[in-house]
Structure formats: structure tokens, C-alpha cells
Amino acid sequence: MTNIRKSHPLLKIINHSFIDLPTPSNISSWWNFGSLLGICLILQIATGLFLAMHYTSDTTTAFSSVTHICRDVNYGWLIRYLHANGASMFFICLFIHVGRGMYYGSYMSMETWNMGIILLFAVMATAFMGYVLPWGQMSFWGATVITNLLSAIPYIGTTLVEWIWGGFSVDKATLTRFFAFHFILPFIIVALVMVHLLFLHETGSNNPSGLNSDADKIPFHPYYTIKDILGILLLFLFLISLVLFSPDLLGDPDNYTPANPLNTPPHIKPEWYFLFAYAILRSIPNKLGGVLALILSILVLALLPHLHTSKLQSLMFRPLTQTLYWILVADLLTLTWIGGQPVEYPFVIIGQLASVLYFAIILIFMPMAGMIEDNMLKMD
């Protein structure tokens, strides 16, 4: 008799996706982050659901309701900090996942890659709206500054901003709709993840060598399930340590002050995971130019398959492009640091140089290095 997991219509899908899935035998721990992202998403939806049971999306009570969750709800403080720091874990895994895709040339599977970029935008939008909900000073002013960027769009900008606000400033209507969107988007993300996996399983996983691995495949379970469980345990160890020892390490002290439209904080800045994009935005003096650079800083990833000049897919055997890749990583860390600094000398010029370098490496230097390496290997 056929095993039920191979015959049952529902179990068959799970079987083909997580059990009998043919997987390259040589994928490294960098391939663990996809499953870690799945775990992060489940954790965020679970903790978010419990927070939503006690949260009120009204400007007069939002801040108090978050305080009430931390003080009066059983383990409310734990749920709240798991959710806040879980978002940071989510983005750490996301950045590593995208970075691995760039390093090993996974972007050559274009459908999967483009779906990933859409997912990245969706997660960033969700995280931004989530940051507004506690209605602290940084929540309010962050929402004001970032939504106000849309006013840079010619002709329809101001109307668009007021339409998003639901009035003439960030107020009750804005908070209510942000809560509604923050609640629904993760479920849309789950659907997008399924499409992402559908595209991935059409082509199969890439591997560190960048070569075709059809001749050397092993079943996903038990080899990679056990490997993923180790990754999940390490992720939880890191997350629980952060939540229990220093839950506010990655937050902003200003967000413990209730939102006040009459008092602007000295430095308005988003959460740490948006700082690199914020630094690119600030490095351009023109408002519209800054907004375009901000969007392009993520959208440039969609160009990677078209900018791939080498005959080798992975960077494993390409020392020149490898060097550029790690310079790019250092550059992104520099941008993250600059995004959290005040707008003054020398931070402005460092931010501008780092922004130019970011786009130059991706659009110019990496494609050039690919051609040089091909030439050195005489692969023509």
C-alpha cells in the first residue's frame, strides 16, 4: 500500500515540499535562513495575534494599551518583546538570505528572485507600520517623515499624502488604517511565500558551487530537517537571550515618550534595519531624488540577473568579485551607522560617498569584475 503522505491530496503537497524534496547534497548553512524566515513569520503572526487582542488603535489609548500589555497581561511583556525583537531577527535573517542569494548567484532563478524582492518590500512595509502602532514619539514622527516623502511625487504628491493620512496630519485615522494594514499584510506575505516556494521548487535549489546538481540530490528529510532544527534552536537562543537580558537594546528610548505633535525629537530615525536605506535617502539633497534613491536601493536587486556577466554563477571561484562583495557588505554596515547619526559634518559626506559606492559596486564594478575574471580564465 502507498504511504498516506504520498497519496493524500493535502499531505502530498507537504511531502513534495518538505519531506521527499530532492535537495542538492552540498548546500551549506547559508541555506538555513529560508526556513528561519518561515519560523520568524510564524512567530510574528502568533505573537502579533495575541498583542492585537489587547491593543487599541486609538490615539488616546494606543500608548496606554501597550503599557497595559506589558504590566497587566499574563506574560504580556514577553509577547511584546518577542514581537519587537522577533522583527529584528526577521530582518537579520532576511539580509543574510538576500546576501546569500547575491553571493551564490541564486538570482539567476528570476521568478523566485523577483518574488523575493516583492516579499522584501511587503515585509518592510509591514515593519514600518508596526513601528507606528505603539504611538510613541518616534512612532509618530517616523510616520510623519516617511509618509511625507510621498509628497515629492509631482502633481499628485500632496493629495496622495493626505489620502494616506486620512486628514491633514498623522492622526487617529492614520493609526487605525496602519493597524488594519499591519494586521492583514502578514497573511498576504504567507501567500506570497507560498508562491516564492512554488517558483523555487520548479527549478530546485541552487548550491554553493553554482553548478547543476541534478546528478547529486538527497531527500530533504531527514538530512536537512535536522539541520534546520539546529538553526532554529540557535535562532531561538539568540532571540530569547535578547528578549530576557536586554529587550530594549535595538529600540529607541524616545518611543517611551507618548506621541506629541508639538514636540519634535532631536533626531528622527527609523528602526535599525531601515537605517541603510534612510542614509541613502538623506544623502541626496533633493527630496524627489532621495525618494527615488531610497526605492532604487532595494529595486536595484531586480537588475542583478541582467548585470551578471560571468560564465560562473557562484562567487565561490571568483576572488575579484568576492572582494567587491565584502566591500559592499562593509559599505552597507557603514550606511547603517550613518543612518543613525545626526545630519552634520563629517556624517553627511561619509553617507554620500557610501551611497555612491553602494550603487557603483552593484551597477558598475561587479559586472566589470565578472568580465575581467572570465578573461583571466580564458572562458570565451
Curated annotation (Swiss-Prot):
GO terms for cellular component: mitochondrial inner membrane; respiratory chain complex III. Heme b b566 binds at residues 97, 196. It is a multi-pass membrane protein. Keywords: Electron transport, Heme, Iron, Membrane, Metal-binding, Mitochondrion, Mitochondrion inner membrane, Respiratory chain, Transmembrane, Transmembrane helix, Transport, Ubiquinone. The keyword Glycoprotein does not apply. It is found in: Mitochondrion inner membrane. Its cofactor is heme b. InterPro entries: Cyt_b/b6_C, Cyt_b/b6_C_sf, Cyt_b/b6_N, Cytb/b6-like_sf, Cytochrome_b, Cytochrome_b_C_euk/bac, Cytochrome_b_N_euk/bac, Di-haem_cyt_TM. Binds 2 heme b groups non-covalently. Its main location: mitochondrion. GO terms for molecular function: metal ion binding; ubiquinol-cytochrome-c reductase activity. GO terms for biological process: mitochondrial electron transport, ubiquinol to cytochrome c. Gene3D superfamilies: Cytochrome Bc1 Complex, Chain C (1.20.810.10). SUPFAM superfamilies: a domain/subunit of cytochrome bc1 complex (Ubiquinol-cytochrome c reductase) (SSF81648), Transmembrane di-heme cytochromes (SSF81342). Heme b b562 binds at residues 83, 182. A ubiquinone binds at residue 201. The chain crosses the membrane at residues 33-53, 77-98, 113-133, 178-198, 226-246, 288-308, 320-340, 347-367. Heme 1 (or BL or b562) is low-potential and absorbs at about 562 nm, and heme 2 (or BH or b566) is high-potential and absorbs at about 566 nm. Component of the ubiquinol-cytochrome c reductase complex (complex III or cytochrome b-c1 complex) that is part of the mitochondrial respiratory chain. The b-c1 complex mediates electron transfer from ubiquinol to cytochrome c. Contributes to the generation of a proton gradient across the mitochondrial membrane that is then used for ATP synthesis. The cytochrome bc1 complex contains 11 subunits: 3 respiratory subunits (MT-CYB, CYC1 and UQCRFS1), 2 core proteins (UQCRC1 and UQCRC2) and 6 low-molecular weight proteins (UQCRH/QCR6, UQCRB/QCR7, UQCRQ/QCR8, UQCR10/QCR9, UQCR11/QCR10 and a cleavage product of UQCRFS1). This cytochrome bc1 complex then forms a dimer. Belongs to the cytochrome b family. This is Cytochrome b. It comes from Eliurus minor. The gene is MT-CYB.
